[in-house]
Amino acid sequence: MKNVAIVSGGYSSECVISLKSAEEVYLSIDKTRYNPYIVLITRNGWTVQGGNKTEFPINKNDFSFIYKGKQIRFDFAYIIIHGTPGEDGLLQGYLDILNIPYSCCGVLSASITFNKYFCNNYLRGFGVETAKSILLKQREQIISPERIIDKLGLPLIVKPNDGGSSFGVTKVTNITQIQLAIRNAFNEGEGVLIESFIPGTEITCGYYKTKNKQVTLPITEIISKNDFFDFEAKYNPGMVEEITPARISKKLTDEIQTLTAHIYDWVGAKGIIRIDYIISPKKEIKMLEVNTIPGMTATSFIPQQIRAAGLNLKEILTEIIESI
């Protein structure tokens, strides 16, 4: 049987969410075909998580570990790190050198999609509509709140250019809030993206390809009790209503699912992805973000959409492992 590393953790605030996703993948993977191991990557080290809180250090020279005197090598890596080094391409580059196949897109695609500002500008070249934005590359970059509002108006969304799970994201409704929002975003990343706020219905759509098929998952409608779908709404029960399939017209559904499939190809994605959108009051489709390693916890969007489609996560994981 293949030894599968379910690679979790990471160096960002999303580490805890990654661990929950890894547990769900571990529970769902077909153990009659694969030997799954949860690998935890942190700044303190790389380890395989054993029973009774035991850990086995990873040999980074060949991505293996020793168990009961025997060297265990991995045949496949299912990457479930949200943020660096999994979502930005660093881990993919390491695995490419070792010739170990993995579940998601490669270095170039990950680099493009992890940088929200670059990804949005790249996709605009294909006609994808996104919010107007300004990128701040470093803390020392000086830009006045007045200039920001003059270009983008109010309200604004201020967020890390390279993060997820809504860490460091602020909705700004007043000029006095801008500088604090920028500082909060810089605490989560090296760049800050300031976007004009787009009112409307927030939705998200999952998609995956294997050797034999391509599947667009049902769309989920997101109704947050907060001003927008922030971290509190994402991970606190009762703060959000998630409706799958979304209560939108068939025409909009078809357009969004088709656009999702196109974006998958345009960015060179692999495995399962999820793309977030806003449907404006004028029924315009505005892309928010491409997630190349979406959350896989029991309550995450992708597992919800898989269930709504009448599909089986165990079978999908097998298809992905065998297709790459």
Swiss-Prot record:
Catalysed reactions listed for this entry: 2 D-alanine + ATP = D-alanyl-D-alanine + ADP + phosphate + H(+)
Binding-site residues for ATP, renumbered to this chain: 149-204
Class of the enzyme per the UniProt entry, highest EC level: ligase
Keywords from the UniProt entry: ATP-binding, Cell shape, Cell wall biogenesis/degradation, Cytoplasm, Ligase, Magnesium, Manganese, Metal-binding, Nucleotide-binding, Peptidoglycan synthesis
Listed cofactors: Mg(2+); Mn(2+)
Binding-site positions, Mg(2+) 1: 276, 289
Domain of life: Bacteria
A Gene Ontology biological process term: peptidoglycan biosynthetic process
One term of GO molecular function: ATP binding
Subcellular location: Cytoplasm
Biological pathway: Cell wall biogenesis; peptidoglycan biosynthesis
Cellular-component GO terms for this entry: cytoplasm
Pfam families, sorted: Dala_Dala_lig_C, Dala_Dala_lig_N
Record text on cofactor binding: Binds 2 magnesium or manganese ions per subunit.
Residues where Mg(2+) 2 binds: 289, 291
Entry function: Cell wall formation.
Protein name: D-alanine--D-alanine ligase
Gene name in the database record: ddl
